[in-house]
């Protein structure tokens, strides 16, 4: 199952690396959930908590649960249109003047029509029809099955560190995917800076459960990993920052546990494309 709002900074292209490393757990948290790509791809846990400081994202998930039919109706009649993209941007900038469903629709449109799926990005277009085909597929994939996946979920709109601390337990698995350091990933008002990263690492030193932290290579993380005996799994992925700037970037998956392939067969199975 794929996330309905994949976007810049999400981990869709890393799922084949992430899912096999997920350990056995009963409680699952995504304190920086964004598009929640890992949650939608993995098998359900007994308790699941998603959180994002961006209220428009948490409103989207809430509307999926409560107003699915209304939101689906708005999505079905959406065409690949520069004007609709601009209108969605206006809604996202002034959410207080619009209904929850209109705000949720705007998030979906911006994630699907913006270049690199950045919510503050420019209108994405091409000359091959790929964008319109992807939009049609996204409409077809926006089904009640997605809503059913959210039924057992707790949705939070809090500071990510508070969520990790609140739901931490020996049988918790925290998937921790913050914005890249000194970036807002096109979705947040404030930049995630080095001080924020150090506060996060200091908290992760104390957790009772298991965690996986994703980030590009960063000296501070390497220092904490060496200090605490955390394992760094390194992969390369393509980063698209603009229409003409695509580059290879090393990405780290930092874990406080040993890889356990057999446990991952139950907890981290990829549920289809």
Task: Report each predicted region and the residues it spans.
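SAM-dependent nucleic-acid methyltransferase catalytic core
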Residues: 1-13, 21, 67-185, 202, ...
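SAM cofactor-binding core of SAM-dependent methyltransferases
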Residues: 20, 24-92
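Short active-site oxyanion
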Residues: 24-27, 46-47, 150-154, 205-211
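Short His-Asn-centered micro-motif
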Residues: 31-32, 51-52, 156-158, 176-178, ...
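Short, polar loop motifs at secondary-structure junctions
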Residues: 33-37, 141-142, 216-219, 258
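Short loop/helix-cap segments at secondary-structure boundaries that form the rim of catalytic
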Residues: 39-44, 166-169, 221-227
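Short, surface-exposed loop/helix-turn segments at secondary-structure junctions
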Residues: 188-192
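Long, positively charged, glycine-interspersed low-complexity recognition regions
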Residues: 193-273
